[in-house]
């Protein structure tokens, strides 16, 4: 399930490059580690790129374009509160991604720590590479943090939520 990566760092992580990669690169998993904001008002919902904001409508359009040719198996939104919604849209950016055609989205329920999240993601991806289903990989990454003295507090392991298909 783990693809050969195509990576956009810093100034390469532009609105144009991100949307082009999402359209053209046949990855089954896309990992976006950035900052974002969610609101039930689409104009106030976005992910941050190097050169500005990737509006939720753009993300929605790009994901819908992939549905027939190359549907996205897993979209990882490694940013604060990507699965936290409001009274009008309860699943936040993660829910929008599912409605737009991603089979599954991994999001967060609250503000996350960059260092611990990077370590958590390594464990999650190691679990996927070992052949675990998405939900199992999530659970086992959480359990490994729960058993770690440094990251046993729920702040570090509990914000991650899988929305959509769990297998």
Regions found by a protein language model. Give the residues of each.
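Catalytic cores of enzymes
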Residues: 1-167
């Amino acid at each position: 399930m783990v693809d050969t990566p195509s990576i956009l760092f810093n100034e390469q992580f532009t609105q144009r490059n991100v949307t082009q990669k999402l359209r053209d690169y046949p990855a089954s998993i896309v990992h976006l580690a950035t900052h974002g904001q969610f609101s039930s008002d689409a104009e106030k919902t976005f992910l941050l790129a190097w050169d500005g904001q990737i509006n939720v409508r753009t993300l929605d359009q790009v994901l819908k374009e992939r549905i027939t040719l190359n549907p996205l198996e897993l979209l990882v939104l490694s940013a604060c509160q990507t699965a936290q919604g409001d009274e009008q849209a309860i699943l936040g950016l993660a829910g929008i991604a599912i409605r737009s055609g991603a089979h599954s989205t991994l999001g967060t329920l609250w503000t996350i720590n960059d260092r611990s999240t990077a370590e958590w993601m390594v464990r999650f991806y190691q679990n996927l590479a070992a052949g675990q289903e998405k939900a199992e990989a999530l659970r086992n990454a959480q359990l490994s943090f729960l058993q770690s003295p440094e990251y046993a507090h729920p702040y570090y392991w509990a914000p991650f939520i899988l929305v959509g298909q769990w297998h």
